[in-house]
């Protein structure tokens, strides 16, 4: 499949969509390999801009959301502990759910809302203005040019956000429980350590990376699928947000059903 054969009209049907997604991912992997081999130059300014867009610009929002999750978590655990004096069981269960399910999904949704939408809008704008044709004329592969720096930034920032979000969430929740129920920080930390088995850590770290790849591919499908109409830019942004959230939730469900034992 080639973008010139598609005439930048985007995929028609799910088979072409899967083909374009595979083509986009393959072009990025080939590009990364050529960069590592010293046969290609990496666009550092574009990568820095992508880091700013997908990371630093939403760090305050990420932090605020994680603080809110920590307060909610602390309040809910406090309510359970007033009825059942089983802090070990409660904290272990809640910590597992938060680390494995809630935080990766929240990080994915926030990254999709910022970096994913921005990528789709940029690609749709390049199409509408004819700049995508200019890239082809100059011998530049449009997919790797627009996607590769953003995908790498998404992967790095998704990993960093998960680590940061976990620290913030459980620091706030632990402080709440210490102040309201007297659960010692040492006991809280011990329960978290017990919940974080190697398998749990691997799953918690892999999910945001998988979600980042899905977000980038969904954004590319919507950006390329916007066509050459200026009005397609708004549709690309909306489609990316809806498609990315749907892909994240469905993938998470499939992971639970098919992979987790």
Kindly give the residue locations of the regions a language model identified:
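Hydrophobic alpha-helical transmembrane segments of small proteolipidic membrane proteins, enriched
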Residues: 25-29, 41, 46, 52-74, ...
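Selective transmembrane-helix segments that form parts of the transport pathway or gating/packing helices
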Residues: 55, 59, 63, 102, ...
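Hydrophobic alpha-helical transmembrane segments of multi-pass membrane transport proteins
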Residues: 90-128
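Membrane-interfacial helix-loop-helix connectors in multipass membrane proteins
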Residues: 75-99, 164-209, 213, 217-239, ...
């Amino acid at each position: 499949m080639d973008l010139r054969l598609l005439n930048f009209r985007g995929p028609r049907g799910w088979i072409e969509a899967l083909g374009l997604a595979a083509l986009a991912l393959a072009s990025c992997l080939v590009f990364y390999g050529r960069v590592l081999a010293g046969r290609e130059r990496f666009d550092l300014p574009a990568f820095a801009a992508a880091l700013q867009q997908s990371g630093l610009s939403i760090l305050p929002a990420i932090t605020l959301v994680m603080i809110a999750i920590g307060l909610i978590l602390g309040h809910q655990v406090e309510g359970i502990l007033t009825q059942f004096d089983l802090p070990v069981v409660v904290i272990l269960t809640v910590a597992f759910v938060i680390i494995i399910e809630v935080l990766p999904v929240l990080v994915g949704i926030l990254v999709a809302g910022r970096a994913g939408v921005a990528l789709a809008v940029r690609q749709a704008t390049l199409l509408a203005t004819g700049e995508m044709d200019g890239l082809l004329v100059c011998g530049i592969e449009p997919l790797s040019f627009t996607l590769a720096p953003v995908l790498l930034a998404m992967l790095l920032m998704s990993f960093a956000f998960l680590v940061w979000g976990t620290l913030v969430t459980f620091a706030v929740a632990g402080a709440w429980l210490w102040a309201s129920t007297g659960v010692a920080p040492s006991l809280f930390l011990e329960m978290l350590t017990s919940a974080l088995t190697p398998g749990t850590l691997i799953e918690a770290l892999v999910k945001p990376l998988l979600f980042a790849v899905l977000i980038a591919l969904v954004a590319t499908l919507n950006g390329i699928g916007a066509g050459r109409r200026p009005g397609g830019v708004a549709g690309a942004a909306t489609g990316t947000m809806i498609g990315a959230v749907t892909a994240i939730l469905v993938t998470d469900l499939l992971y639970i059903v098919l992979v987790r034992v």
